[in-house]
Amino acid sequence: MTDTTAKRRRRKDARPAEIINAAMDVFVEHGFAGAKLTDVAKRAGVAKGTLYLYFETKEDLFRATAREALTANLVAVEQSSAAFNGSIVDLVPVLLKRAAGRMGDGRVPGIVRMVLAESRAFPDLARIWHDEVVARILGRLTELVSAAQDRGEVRAGDPGLFAISIVGPMVLGVLFQEVFGSDSLHAPNLDMLATQHAETVLNGLLLRSGGH
């Protein structure tokens, strides 16, 4: 394989990621309804026909975008939790800090806002976001809480509801910034929220001596 051929192969392999990155910007700026595939192709520096080689519909492109939006955080959660053998006391603060870092990417909250705003007109948006992001996060957290209950660390209760309690305030913090602006007097600092909430939620989750 010549150097030129190798460069072309690398360029071709990078195209899906470049298209997804461009699509994320376009979706955030224009919403799902207003996003045009021609704009995505132009921003990605490819022909519109090239885009269709990888994504047949705008819904397919959004699915890939939704997956990419939180991939780094999801993989970190899944890998960290899979290899983790310690207490949930040590794991929850790490996971929330990583979530805060990923949510700090302005495009991720923008995608969330778009889903909330347009899911009634485009029900598939909510379904895609649920399947690619929400279900994976809550599913893994539920498993972690259930395992901690089996070890006698976490009090009795529905582990799925506990999982929502863990991530809920972080989601609310992101939505607050998106709706009211990060310059609001009450807009939460996500890193500080992650630290304080980890302490608060663990204080409620942990089983104390005496079984309470």
Q: What are the roles of these predicted feature ranges?
A:
Residues 1-6, 94, 98, 135, ...:
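C-terminal peripheral helix-coil segments that are non-catalytic and often amphipathic
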Residues 1-46, 53-60, 86:
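Basic, helix-initiating cap at the start of DNA-binding domains
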Residues 15, 58, 65, 69, ...:
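Hydrophobic/aromatic residues within well-ordered alpha-helical segments
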Residues 20, 27, 32, 36-37, ...:
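Amphipathic alpha-helical segments enriched in hydrophobic/aromatic and basic residues
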Residues 28, 42, 56-60, 64, ...:
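Residues in soluble alpha-helical coiled-coils and helical-bundle/repeat scaffolds
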Residues 67-88, 176-189:
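Short, flexible, glycine-rich and Lys/Arg-enriched loop motifs at helix boundaries
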Residues 78-112, 160-166:
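Hydrophobic alpha-helical connector segments
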Residues 101-143, 184-187:
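Short secondary-structure transition hinges
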